[in-house]
């Protein structure tokens, strides 16, 4: 009996030994697999890897490499540049809120950095692009009909670039983008003014048109605002002010359709009943129609 028990215990010991070896091998494999390939990589190599990923348009991969660099090497010129390029990668990937957060963190940490003008410029790009990006792509919504809080922040960012860093390489483009944003804000006011006009609220329509002219002079919609002022004064029975508006408009845009009694025209009512038609600006539609006739 003793000999038989010893013989039977041998296979058991062999099986137990095999199980130990299997578990050990599995553990080693998992440890190797779980180890990040970038861990321990020299800072120069890690930065070069992230930069190459950016050049190839792999924004997510670049962001990951730059974040790994910052985690492993929290100080130094490579770290500062990696933080900047990580924010750019986030912006290019459409992660605008993340980009703005990264930029704000950098500005707080390095307020006098040599590339600080670029950071404000990039924040302007991200803020100007962050509002309902998906909806604009799918439904082609007019930019002036959106919430304008982030475009206004973008305008403030570009204004910082032009005022604090007028000689930077980003100042000229920032000025141009400010002009475009002012037109968006003016269009927003024009759409509101036309909304009131369509409903016969002529005092409110005149007030919006006046605000547009005072707040956004020389915008692309200034002549429309003058025309709407004239139309409002006609309906309010103020012939003198209506005639003044007509004279001003004739000097600045003699071909404006209001002078021929053919303005404003509103979108066809059936369009508003179609949920798939997209939201269009009455101001833009009328202005584009005039431009096409020229």
Regions found by a protein language model. Give the residues of each.
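Bacterial N-terminal signal peptides that target proteins for export
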Residues: 2-16
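Bacterial N-terminal signal peptides
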Residues: 15-25
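Low-complexity intrinsically disordered segments
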Residues: 11-12, 23, 76
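Coiled-coil-like amphipathic alpha-helices with heptad-repeat character
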Residues: 8, 25-28
């Amino acid at each position: 009996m003793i000999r038989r028990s010893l013989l039977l215990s041998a296979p058991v010991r062999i099986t137990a030994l095999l199980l130990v070896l299997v578990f050990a091998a599995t553990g080693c494999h998992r440890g190797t697999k779980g180890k990040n390939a970038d861990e321990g990589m020299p800072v120069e190599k890690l930065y070069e890897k992230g930069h190459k990923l950016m050049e190839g348009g792999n924004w997510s991969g670049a962001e990951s490499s730059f974040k790994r660099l910052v985690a492993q090497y929290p100080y130094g010129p490579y770290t500062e540049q990696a933080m900047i390029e990580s924010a750019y990668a986030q912006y290019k990937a459409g992660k605008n809120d993340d980009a703005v957060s990264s930029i704000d963190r950098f500005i707080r940490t390095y307020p006098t950095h040599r590339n600080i003008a670029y950071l404000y410029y990039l924040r302007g790009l991200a803020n100007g692009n962050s509002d309902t990006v998906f909806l604009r792509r799918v439904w082609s919504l007019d930019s002036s009909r959106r919430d304008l809080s982030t475009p206004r922040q973008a305008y403030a960012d570009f204004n910082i670039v032009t005022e604090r860093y007028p000689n930077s390489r980003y100042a000229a483009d920032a000025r141009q983008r400010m002009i475009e944003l002012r037109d968006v804000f003016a269009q927003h006011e024009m759409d509101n003014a036309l909304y009131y006009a369509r409903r016969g609220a002529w005092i409110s329509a005149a007030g919006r048109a006046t605000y547009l002219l005072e707040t956004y002079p020389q915008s692309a919609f200034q002549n429309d605002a003058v025309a709407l002022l004239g139309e409002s004064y006609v309906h309010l029975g103020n012939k003198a002010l209506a005639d003044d508006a007509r004279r001003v408009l004739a000097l600045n845009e003699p071909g404006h359709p209001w002078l021929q009694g053919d303005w404003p025209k509103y979108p066809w009512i059936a369009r508003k009943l179609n949920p798939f038609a997209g939201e269009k600006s009455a101001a833009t539609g009328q202005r584009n129609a005039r431009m096409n006739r020229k």
